[in-house]
Amino acid sequence: MNAARRGFKDGNDPVVARLMNQQRQMATSMGQFLGEEVLYVMRGIARGDSAVPIAAAATNVSCPGRERTNEGRAGFEGTYKDAAPVDIRLGLLRVGDVMIGAVNAEVFNPIAQRLKRESPFKATMMTTLTNGSARSGYIPDDESYGKYTFEVLSSRLKPGCAETAIVNGILGLMDTARRVN
């Protein structure tokens, strides 16, 4: 029986007690290690400029939508019909030379990696599930659309639009934000 369940019966089992104690010790050790590493990094950080440019911008992009017409789990091809276009909200926060792109949906990692590659700024990152929730579901990168994973099957976006729209949209916001001094 799972020792984490309420009212578990193995509570008096010495093997379970030993394993639970080991888990507590490991969690404590990891916490101490993390705390020491944070202190080490903090000591090495040079104080930066006190006045850096700060800017924010937002826009929407729209991509063709789809509606799934069959049921099934991962591993089986989905069938779809055309649906209303899906709006995706994009944002950007600039703090000095750091660019933080934002998307209001859960974006596959290759899209964020592409943004970082194409960004003219060395310090570029992407946050997701930001500024509300898109009705898109997951947003796969173009290459992933051929895979029958739950995330791809459940996406309400047709292939071939969202990846480029997101990357180009955030790069456009960077162009706007770079003019702020």
Listing of model-derived features with the role each one plays in the protein:
Residues M1-N181:
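Non-catalytic substrate/cofactor recognition surfaces at enzyme active-site rims
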